Amino acid sequence: MTRYKATIAYDGTDFAGFQSQTNQRTVQEEIEKVLSKLNSFEPVILQGSGRTDSGVHAFGQVIHFDLNGKARDLERLRFGLDTQTPADIAVKKVELVPDDWHARYQKHEKTYEYYLENSVTRSPFHRHSKAYFRYPLNFELMQGAMAKLVGQHDFTGFTASGSSVDDKVRTIYQAEIIQLDKENFKFIFRGNGFLYKQVRNMVGTVIKIGNDRMPVSQIDKILTSKNRNFAGPTAAPEGLYLKEVKYEPINEI
């Protein structure tokens, strides 16, 4: 058996999320179908760096999987995966990794980006690739709110009720909002890990602050109280992208 690491991108619009689910179309299931073909039709179970929800996209999700036999030509393997998976999945890179390397448990940091269209009328061409908010937003208020998210905090107040993780302390290295033009914003979050729906809950809260329906100090209240009820709504999934998963260097195999 040989272990491989792959970097993939996908349009999450028509998926019920990344992780396999019964009677649902998922990214994991589509890739595993192709991996099985490339593995003499023996089942292959891949592991991802984490899940993404239905409608959420990825520029740089990372997975690992094992295939029978010796190491294969990496470009041929990448090409085979890329051309046999559906059009809404792209396999960008395949690498060899040690047998004990794990996409989820290896130390890493993640970067998420969130794209928001802020205009009176919504563009029909962006309905699957950006979130939309039609009411006025104050850029300076949103900048102030984002700055308060940087650092090590207990993010219980920003996670959804379905989270099964006990330790909800995470470190955010970068929380930035960029005004791309008059009608478009990009949120950037880089950290050592994120809780279930944490990024979308933070974005929803910052949007509410930008709309002057919450004070900037609400961020402090959410962090100290650990109460989800003090935060804003969960932002829509279509604006969210897993941009990059960055690992410590792998030793030569």
Curated annotation (Swiss-Prot):
EC main group: isomerase
Ligand binding (substrate): 112
Catalyzed chemical reaction(s): uridine(38/39/40) in tRNA = pseudouridine(38/39/40) in tRNA
Keyword Transit peptide found: no
Record's keyword annotation contains Isomerase: yes
GO MF annotations, alphabetized: RNA binding; tRNA pseudouridine(38-40) synthase activity
Disulphide bridges, residue numbers: none
EC numbers, comma separated: 5.4.99.12
Superkingdom in the source lineage: Bacteria
GO biological-process terms attached to the record: tRNA pseudouridine synthesis
Annotated keywords: Isomerase, tRNA processing
InterPro entries to which the protein is assigned, alphabetical: PsdUridine_synth_cat_dom_sf, PsdUridine_synth_TruA, PsdUridine_synth_TruA_a/b_dom, PsdUridine_synth_TruA_C, TruA/RsuA/RluB/E/F_N
UniProt cross-references to Pfam families, sorted A to Z: PseudoU_synth_1 (PF01416)
Active site: 53 (nucleophile)
Family indicated by similarity: Belongs to the tRNA pseudouridine synthase TruA family.
PANTHER family found in the cross-reference section: PSEUDOURIDYLATE SYNTHASE, TRNA PSEUDOURIDINE SYNTHASE-LIKE 1
HAMAP family found in the cross-reference section: TruA (MF_00171)
Biological role: Formation of pseudouridine at positions 38, 39 and 40 in the anticodon stem and loop of transfer RNAs.
Quaternary state and interactors: Homodimer.
The protein, known as: tRNA pseudouridine synthase A
Organism the protein comes from: Lactococcus lactis subsp. cremoris (strain SK11)
Name of the gene this protein is made from: truA
